[in-house]
Amino acid sequence: MKKRELNFAEIKAIKDGYIPAPYVLEEGEQINDFYLEPVYFENEDGPTIGVTTCGVIVKDGLFFKDMDNSGELAPYKDWRLDHETRAKDMVAHLPLNQQAGLVLNTLWNTPLSMTVDEAKDENGNIVPAKIFKRFVEGEPEPKSILPGVSMRVDDSDILVHKLAAGVYRGDMRASAALSAMYHNLGTQYVEYEACQGGVAIPYSMHTNPINIGYPDFLGVGAAVMGDGNFDLIYNMADTDRKMMKAAGQNIMYGPQVDIATDPRWPRNSGTYGEVPEITSGIIKELVRGYQNGEDGLNEGSVVLTVKHFPGDGPAENGFEPHMPIGQWRLYPTEGSMEKYHLPPFQAAFDMKASSIMPDYSRVATDGRSTPQYYRGKLTSTEEVGSTYSKELITDLARDVMGFDGYVNSDSGITTVQIYGVEDLTVPQRYAKAISAGTDVIGGNSDSENIVKAVEEGYLPKEDLDRANYRRLLSLFKVGRVDNPYLDPDYADKVRKENFEGAKKAAYVANQKAVVLVKNHDNVLPMKKGAKIYIECFKGIDPGAALAQSMGAGVAGGDDNEVLRKQIAALFEAKGYTIVEKAEEAEYAYLHVWPCSNGMVFYQYAMPVIEMVDNQLFEAREANKSQKKTGEMVSITTLKDVDKIKTISEAVHANGGKVVATCVVCNPWLLDKLEPYVDGLTFQYTISPVAMGNALGAQVDVLSGDYNPTGKISLTMVSCMDVIEITEKEIDGVMREVCASPNDVPGYDKDQYIDPAILARAKGGSYAYYDADGNYYRAGFGLSYK
């Protein structure tokens, strides 16, 4: 590698001229052999220019990045012009293969080291292949845990397929500096490859929401409902924004603002709950915090990708649309989309959210649904996945609701979630999605299929130009085009400066997220110094390994003893005595963590929200359809659930009290828990990085060191009658229909349920009714004072 020596004293004297690229490859060398330290040129009243293999144009004493090494100051290189002019002109200069690559994101970008030191050789030089995986000819395709989605991610995505973005899956323990270096390498590769025939576009790292210790999403909803304001949301987002930007994580694949309405849906746990007003308030503060203001993108922004438009909550009886078995959204209730599901998206659009992600699913337009309108407009008539629906992502989102960003599909929509477009070829699917209004498509690197779509006439060139323009415009607005490079040391500094404060705020948020729902005879808080017997109960989580690999796993595994010891240590630190026999205890404390069988990527039965141990349920055609196979499958949502009653009887027989915490990731049926306990709290957190905070916070509440303020964010189901599934003939087809509508939140379901069914429910409601006469409906929660 040849590095040109630059005399910056002489450079400053140049009024008009050209500065060649600071680095030049020599014969036999490849760009991925080196980590190049960027060279910077400071404009006194303009942006800094950062380059590695691009030259710099000097005009009127100002520096401009020569993004194609042509020597011409084209409008897209001229930072004095407005963003729109530059983005439009850049599109005009892109070759077709780079335009195609600009549409795509890879899914599994994972740095190969944890620290900068790990990425060095024995001489202290950075080895790119220790950070960014290098393409190896003939290497077999990694086995995919996501059917139809490639797990292969290496530098060929950039150097061959012309992509300029990927989803960062780095371990949270990886240093911020290492993340920044990964970003810099991606940008370096794009810059070099573009200068051989294209345009240097910044490399973008998307990331799913990364928990830095705050409660999981339902817990956030519970906390703000208790607060009565959304202050903690803005502070969380603003702090996270600073750390993300410094580390090169420029785009958030979130937040998820779906409203939870079907009780069996496994992704209820990823929502902020079921109350549209609460989710709307949360998304407003998230946009303000992450995008650094209320007026759209700016140089301090992280791009938000609000999902899953127009709301995935009304799933068909809990089946999830990552797989064909769950491809339908149902709207049996007139006006439900406008009343419940679209308000959070409207709130996001009003705050100028910069991107949306459509859901995988498609609306059922047969007798299972009623036509849905928004502001007088019929929302959808075509039974295709939302990414393919012009009615939804252009006519509704843009024309009616005022969205003005870019549309980023979820991953796999051209290979797996091809609902309604099964008969189209892959190039035709790309064409339909892009022409419908989708600008970015996730999870693929097959840019050649987009090229083919244009060349074979399926995709009008102007539609591809529009998609590229919208994506590039966001890059110009956040100020990443002229100097996309990052300072790894600064990334570590920013994380260090912000992380301690974030940890403290996150712990307080966990305290606020604890919900006290039962306090019979004021059994709580627990008497200081008392003897406590602890037992942990957990279900079998078939999706834990997959979730863990995606960076969204759950803590604790199946080892209840490890969890018991962790909780015991927290009680002991507050002066309590832990005993080994329930009969010796003044209090039995039960930590109850049910696990859903409703996996996203392996669905073999209807999701179960009862607390069951080795109970048989009807099997379905796994992932393919809801058709019953005639076989039965064993499901355990809570091991040894019957032991709860046994422990309760033993403790009560000796004059003791029973207190429990239920981990709520779905609206569990509590008939095998609540009747046997004197005190009951809810907490909503299962992610590993936040589990310690969640456990500490719940012990703070149980001990009386924190007065609980949290409110239920997800109405708990009263009995199986209110969610009973019956078969009915609809439009000549036998369908399974839920007793309560799939599209209405739990707090509002009673008005739509047959009164005869409600009469069979304890308390006469969809909401769970406890022994003390309280309904576990969204918004309910007790305090000590």
Cite the ranges covered by each PLM segment.
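Solvent-exposed loop/turn segments at secondary-structure junctions
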Residues: T106-L112, A174-L178, P209-G213, I251-M252, ...
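Acidic/polar loop patches that form or flank catalytic/metal-binding clefts of enzymes
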Residues: S355-P358, G402-S409, V440-G443, P460-R466, ...
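C-terminal non-catalytic regions of proteins with extracellular/luminal or membrane-system context
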Residues: M1-G61, M67, E122-G148, R152-D155, ...
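Sec-exported extracytoplasmic/periplasmic mature domains
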Residues: K88-Q99, L104-L112, Q188-E193, R241-N250, ...
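Hydrophobic faces of well-ordered beta-strands that scaffold small-molecule active sites
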Residues: L104, P147-V149, Y168-M172, I201-T207, ...
